[in-house]
Amino acid sequence: MRTIKIIQTASQLPEKIVSNDDLAGMMDTSDEWIRSRTGIFKRHIAVDETTASLAASVLQKLLKGSGISADQIDFVLVATMSPDSMAPSTAAQASALAGLSNAFAMDINVACSGFVYGLTLAHGLVNTLGSHYGVVIGAETLSKLVDWQERSTAVLFGDGAAGVLVEAVDGPERLLAADLKTFGKEAKSLTAGHLWSSTTWNQPEKGSRYFQMDGHAVYSFATRQVAASIKRTFEKISADIGDTDYFLLHQANQRIIDKVADLLKQPADRFLSNLSKYGNTSAASIPLLLDEMVTGNIVKSGQLLTLSGFGAGLSVGSIVYKY
């Protein structure tokens, strides 16, 4: 069986930066209130950028950085919960913008768990289809799903995109194990982007196109299920959780990251974070963190990484990867 090797990382952020003080001028909040409850200092917000254009920029950077040509790419997977349109897919639009002609492209919507699901699917694709090069991107413009008068959610989210270019290789396994799980009965704890027909008599609530979240329920789910998912993943391999060099969790809230570290009884400094600069970027958060840490020479070849995402669905997904 072949495995996937990450040979390039890349990211793209919108130009506009919105600080906590900027938000304090728009609603009843403060920099101190946001920092103390979330760990977020600022976020990037798309103005002229779209989900597809951000994803395309990442794709172009991946090609340039790796030296792989556009016609060598076999597949493009884009994890997003904030597409520009229902059809065509963000992956199809990004592929066209980046000049790809031979790749098949598809979107994945598992919200904040999407990048982990995408990497797991990529591992399967190289074996079932014989693909050689593929791209997995997380791209979001969550700002269009935010009610900018609702403090409990408006302070959390940011826009951005990041991803990886993977190569199918023989030899020692790199994606050592995965755990994916969805808890549909808890779906109402986090919703956004409701669509409805103009002929439907029972219209959704006015605000249902925007994020609606039961913060306490999501916090409880995330801390319990991320820790449980990581434990299940390690039960599948001959390694211990403590062998992890770095944990890259979905960047939703610093309190969640700290609590998971505590539940797993692992040192907090192994849990990498860039949440303060970007906020919750959903499917983009893990690859954005990975790219920053690879570029900064924090994550190096040969290290054992544990990636775990959680979010709407409610969903959770974890992988153990030998970088």
Curated annotation (Swiss-Prot):
| EC number(s) recorded for this UniProt protein | 2.3.1.180
Cited Gene3D superfamilies: 3.40.47.10
- Keyword DNA-binding annotated: no
What is the designated name of this protein? Beta-ketoacyl-[acyl-carrier-protein] synthase III
Which keywords fit this entry according to its UniProt record? Acyltransferase, Cytoplasm, Fatty acid biosynthesis, Fatty acid metabolism, Lipid biosynthesis, Lipid metabolism, Multifunctional enzyme, Transferase
Localization per Swiss-Prot or TrEMBL: Cytoplasm
- A GO biological-process term: fatty acid biosynthetic process
- Encoding gene per record: fabH
Its lineage reads:
Bacteria, Bacillati, Bacillota, Bacilli, Lactobacillales
